[in-house]
């Protein structure tokens, strides 16, 4: 009689999941080494931690990374825009370090493939969720700060966010991406897009996901705490995809 295989949990499950992926590419994209223990912690989402014996997760590192990111971006904007009032550079910073801005950076370094997620998140495409990508990016910055100090962490921020920082402007922070997309399509004599929006979660904490279609083709996908913001992000993604095709 064969015995049922015992499910690996706890630190053994953590080590097994972490070692299943080669992290060399990620570290190369970051341009810095991170100790194994810190890197494991930075990549451990609470869903994985909770499903494997309440292991430590990356939320404390995320807290640190958020502070490092905010200071590094704020100081750089202060230097780049000496004549801009506080209200403008504050809006610029908010746009750059937003969930969407962080998720963009995470996708550029293919961070999603390295995040340790629980089964529930894996089944709901957690590796592509803006919220998870953004939080893990901050956790990595927190890990870099803990190991190397502020100056190294700042340099990583300025390298990763170089384009966003140098092209920031107060104008366009609250851009209506749905209108921008509509105008771009009109110029190309393309048909209008359609939006499909769904929501999950309890009434007090709903997460909306919007998908924008051009005919039968998905052009963009966005998340947000309400339908409007989710559709705006989906429209932004669609607009960027159109621009890439034209480039």
Curated annotation (Swiss-Prot):
Subcellular location: Cytoplasm
Reaction it catalyzes: Endonucleolytic cleavage to 5'-phosphomonoester
GO cellular component, one term: cytoplasm
Cofactor(s), by name: Mg(2+)
Domain DRBM, first and last residues per copy: 176-244
Catalytic residues (UniProt): 66, 138
Residues of the RNase III domain: 23-149
Main localization of the protein described in the UniProt heading: cytoplasm
Entries under Pfam families matching the protein: dsrm (PF00035), Ribonucleas_3_3 (PF14622)
Residue numbers binding Mg(2+): 62, 135, 138
Keyword RNA-binding: yes
Function statement: Digests double-stranded RNA. Involved in the processing of primary rRNA transcript to yield the immediate precursors to the large and small rRNAs (23S and 16S). Processes some mRNAs, and tRNAs when they are encoded in the rRNA operon. Processes pre-crRNA and tracrRNA of type II CRISPR loci if present in the organism.
PANTHER family associated with the record: RIBONUCLEASE 3, RIBONUCLEASE III
Name of the protein in question: Ribonuclease 3
């Amino acid at each position: 009689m064969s015995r049922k295989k015992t499910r690996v949990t706890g630190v053994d499950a953590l080590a097994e999941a972490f070692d299943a992926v080669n992290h060399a590419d990620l570290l190369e994209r970051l341009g810095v080494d991170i100790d194994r223990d810190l890197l494991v912690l930075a990549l451990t989402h609470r869903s994985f931690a909770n499903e494997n014996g309440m292991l430590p997760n990356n939320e404390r590192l995320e807290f640190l990374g958020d502070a490092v990111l905010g200071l590094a971006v704020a100081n750089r904007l202060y230097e780049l825009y000496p004549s801009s009032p506080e209200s403008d550079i504050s809006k610029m910073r908010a746009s750059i370090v937003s969930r969407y801005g962080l998720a963009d950076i995470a996708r550029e370094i293919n961070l999603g493939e390295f995040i340790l997620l629980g089964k529930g998140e894996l089944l709901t495409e957690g590796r592509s969720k803006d919220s998870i990508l953004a939080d893990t990016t901050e956790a990595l910055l927190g890990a870099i700060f803990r190991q190397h100090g502020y100056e190294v962490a700042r340099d990583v921020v300025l390298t990763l966010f170089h384009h966003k920082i140098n092209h920031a402007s107060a104008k366009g922070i609250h851009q209506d991406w749905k209108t921008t997309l509509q105008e771009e399509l009109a110029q190309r004599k393309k048909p209008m897009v359609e939006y499909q929006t769904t929501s999950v979660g309890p009434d007090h904490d709903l997460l909306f996901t919007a998908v924008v279609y051009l005919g039968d083709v998905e052009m963009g996908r966005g998340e947000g705490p309400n339908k409007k913001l989710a559709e705006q992000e989906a429209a932004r993604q669609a607009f960027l995809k159109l621009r890439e095709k034209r480039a």
